[in-house]
Amino acid sequence: MGNAPEPAAAASAASPPPPPPPGADGRRRRTVLILGALLVLAIAVSAVAYVLTRPRPVGSAPAGGAVPAATPAAAPSTPPSPAPSPTPTPEPPAVALNILLIGSDSRINERAAAAAGSASDQRGDALVLIHIPADRQSVYGISIMRDLWVDIPGHGTAKVNAGLELGGLPLMTQTVEALLGAHIDHTIMVDFEGFAAMTDALGGVDVDVKQSFTGTVDDRVHFPAGVNHLNGLKALAFVRERHAFADGDYQRVRNQQAFLKAMMAKLAAEGGLAERGTVRKLITTVLPHVTVDASFTLASLEDLAFSLRKTPPGRGVFFTLPTAGTGTSRDGQSIVLQDPAATAALSAALGSGMLARYVAANNLQNGN
């Protein structure tokens, strides 16, 4: 598919956003809080934007402030001439965005190595490309099987998640760009400890489990078919299990998608991110576990959130990059084989802004 564009500049470990400058109003502080949540919860961008831009009832106070008290009426005077209305600043045209979300069992020193583009002993356990179309009317999550056999730029062929081990976030980004023939604008890595903590900060998440199973590690948690309320540890067991299934990693990816959709639904519900305290708790809980590329600044987050203000809350479609089944590499590894024709079709849909048509044509509206 040709050479992929250079990935974003070197990554950096995330840190809590700086306090607003003196004199900043309550709305600015609220914006910073919600944009911090957007950083952590890239898959919930539509819900965050909804909360950010939802109109406040007339007469209500800004977040964190009280309604001003009435003051005694002054003596009648001639009203001043009205000031001329300011000329509105035109909104820049929106463009499609691709954000790579990585779930990794990384430690603090390994996250720093990944941010710097250094080799480490970590691999991405979950890879999801978040695609936000230019019209901002939906959000797509494309799961990539971690054992997919691909070209790693400069390193030959290997499992796709080896990009993180061999060259940190920059090489992982470049690898997915080469695979899909699509530029990735930003990359976010969340470790699994942060994933569990975020779930607990939300009060748990209700997930509709389609296939009953019992975990094969740790406490061997049982997940009956139907709606399960998952706390952090149970959620972690749910999204990481693969040995309990006949099709292994394929069902694990489906479970990851089900959890992400359930989390989006909770965030989009009334009260999910509407409470400032809830948002702050999410940010302070999860930010120590997040690594992002250096270009994912507060300004870029603000631009993204503003452009998403008309996105219907909770609109998300999750599916898996098509593959050609499983096989064995020359050195004996169990791998997932690429489906070149299907990957090319998806790449063309991403590049032409026709992903909605691709999803409809392949009946992926409810995932796969």
Where do the model's predicted regions map?
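Non-catalytic, solvent-exposed segments at the cell envelope interface
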Residues: 2-368
